[in-house]
Amino acid sequence: METTIPPRWQTVRAGLLTAHLTRSGGGVYSSVRQLARMLDAAPGIEVDVFGPGRLGDKDVAEWSPLPLRTAPTLGPNFFSFAPGLLRRVLEADLNLVHLHGLWMHPSAVSLAFTRRTGKPHLVSPHGMLDPWALGNSSWKKRVAAAVFEKENLKRAACLHALNAAEAGSIRDYGFAGPVCVIPNGVEVPPADQPRPAAPWWTKATPEVKTLLYLGRLHPKKGLPALLEAWRRLDPGLRKEWRLLIAGWDERGHQVALRRMASMLRIEATVTFPGPLFGADKKAAYHHCHGFILPSLSEGLPMAVLEAWACGKPVLMTPQCNLPEGFETGAAQRIEPEEKSIAGALTDFLSTDDAQRECMGAKGRALVLERFSWPVIAADMAAVYRWLAGHGAKPASVTEQ
């Protein structure tokens, strides 16, 4: 006699599809990599990762032990066209595809997967449908929308929003299907974990405190306004602090920022160490005295969650979509313009260490309560089971 396996015990094979497979992919890369690892450890979920490009050994190692299936690219980098990628996805016998990011060739692959197999795909825009993001390089996005992206979103079984603000942007773009709201998660180091060795920039002047920015050097991050605000600070206060702007360059923005720091005559207290990964990144978080993100547009910034996880106080804009940071006292609000940033910096840098440490402790408590990966992965696994027909619609899903 044949035994029927209850749906909740059936394995769901999910393909995570993204153009952001390398460390230069910033917050999308970090969040997708951690989500993939946590989902693969969830009961009844198997994960393969797909994307365009040839990865170096260091990037491949970052995804281990997950299967990483890539296809070589042709043409300009901004589109990530990989002719063999669809074949890799179709060969994997997946129950569903989960696309991360928009406007690039992987979107066309997720659409083709659903058309060819009749199986569902889920889309995580990662803030790419926010008004500011839509207006940036808008002509390229209009072309992509006309050719494949609007149809890709229309045919999606569900869209994933990181927060209520992004869910609103998704609806404003015209998507009428189900939306699940699940935030990014973050790894929280144990409280008794030894601090990493001090980074090089602290050794020459250990008495100088560090305000850290870590992320892409891109116009949307609001860094020119931050430099202007830094210039407005009292020179005596500036001597007690260094502004560390760490990250990978996009579109030559780092050259413009360095030139601006020189023109403003603040280069003595502003450091550009380049991109930081692995142990260097951990050291930057652990040895800074505060973190700042003056961004004009975000989905849900991993960098802020990582700073909180290390117990660091944060200055950020409302556009970071983490209002709970302001509500709990874990973050100080700034607007993305120099006067607001300068005023907030004066208050923040002048306050005593105990107050800043109290803010940081509130941030760590916040991520432990609401942004830990086991909880986030369990919520996403429930969405996968529902889409694959192996479970009921989760509470995270709403319909218009």
Short names for language-model regions:
Residues 354-369, 379-382:
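A short, well-ordered alpha-helix in the C-terminal region of glycosyltransferases
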Residues 51-56, 186, 214, 242-256, ...:
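Glycosyltransferase donor-sugar binding loop
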Residues 313-317:
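Short hydrophobic beta-strand element within catalytic cores of glycosyltransferases
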Residues 116, 142-158:
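Membrane-proximal helix-turn-helix segments that form the acceptor-binding/catalytic region
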Residues 331-339, 347-353:
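Conserved acidic donor-binding segment of nucleotide-sugar-dependent glycosyltransferases
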Residues 30, 34, 209, 213-232, ...:
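A conserved mid-protein helix/loop that constitutes part of the nucleotide-sugar donor-binding site
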Residues 165, 185:
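Carbohydrate-associated surface elements
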Residues 296:
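Aromatic "clamp/platform" in nucleotide-sugar-dependent glycosyltransferases that forms part
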